[in-house]
């Protein structure tokens, strides 16, 4: 082969290799669906709150949560509005494989009942597994309210150690929220329990409807990082990715708090 032909042949090989590498690189890039995606933000205090979903490179959810700017902890109302102001935060579309629909987020300037346990100023983060219309139907003026409140989920669908408070379900069901369940191992004894942060669960009309982290403003200002296992039920009412961990962390660079439900694991209804 002449030298010119050798050079031309070698050049063709180089071009082919570069083209192949480019195509492989592009293919990998197109298949990588990882990232963190955000829902629309809303104002709270002097800052903002927004939901997010984090996916792995296959597009499966790893974590969902709320990002809360540090300024949100300042400029908060000193008195609660009547009715209370609730932020309804949609998740981004990338959270659709999880069981969560939206987050109801609110600030309690004087805590809430039972005040002997949860009377400190704090935030509630209801991660709902039903849509906003279903939550809005939790209305004590409806004639079937008491019946639907008393329709508790099958025990196999309730996370381990969670029970309803003393009293009837109708008395304990909060309008436009649901019936709150507490963990019997949390030591909720009046006069002894020191509320900093806790995870509540909830139901309505036979359905396990929400997971609710609650935490005081005072505790959040300490900027602690925590990650805890979420207690699981024996079975699941619906198929989808359920969380196995709950976490709180502060990003000093972004000046943001993350309240997360992570360790997403696919579960099947049974």
Regions found by a protein language model. Give the residues of each.
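Bacterial Sec-dependent N-terminal signal peptides
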Residues: 2, 7, 16-38
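Alpha-helical and His/Cys-centered functional microenvironments
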Residues: 6, 11, 128-130
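Intrinsically disordered, low-complexity, compositionally biased regions/tails
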Residues: 8-9, 15, 182, 195
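Metal-centered catalytic cores of metalloenzymes
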Residues: 29-270
């Amino acid at each position: 082969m002449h030298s010119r032909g050798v050079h031309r042949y070698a050049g063709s090989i180089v071009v082919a290799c570069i083209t192949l590498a480019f195509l492989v690189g592009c293919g990998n890039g197109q298949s990588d669906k990882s990232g963190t995606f955000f829902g629309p933000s809303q104002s709270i205090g002097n800052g903002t709150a927004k939901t997010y979903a984090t996916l792995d490179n296959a597009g499966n959810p790893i974590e969902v949560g709320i990002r809360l700017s540090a300024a949100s902890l300042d400029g908060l109302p000193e008195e609660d509005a009547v009715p209370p102001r609730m932020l309804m935060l949609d998740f981004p579309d990338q959270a659709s494989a999880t069981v969560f629909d939206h987050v109801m987020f609110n600030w309690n300037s004087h805590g809430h009942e039972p005040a002997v346990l949860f009377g400190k100023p704090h935030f509630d983060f209801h991660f709902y597994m039903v849509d906003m219309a279903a939550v809005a139907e939790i209305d004590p003026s409806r004639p079937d309210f008491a019946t639907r409140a008393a329709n508790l989920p099958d025990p196999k669908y309730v996370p381990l150690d969670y029970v309803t408070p003393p009293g009837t379900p109708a008395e304990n069901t909060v309008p436009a929220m649901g019936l709150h369940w507490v963990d019997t191992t949390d030591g909720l004894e009046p006069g002894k329990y020191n509320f900093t942060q806790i995870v509540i669960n909830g139901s309505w009309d036979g359905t396990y409807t929400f997971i609710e982290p609650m935490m005081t403003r005072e505790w959040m200002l300490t900027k602690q990082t925590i990650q805890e296992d979420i207690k699981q039920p024996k079975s699941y009412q619906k198929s989808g990715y359920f969380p196995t961990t709950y976490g709180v962390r502060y990003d000093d660079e972004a000046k943001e708090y993350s309240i997360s439900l992570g360790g997403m694991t696919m579960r099947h209804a049974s």
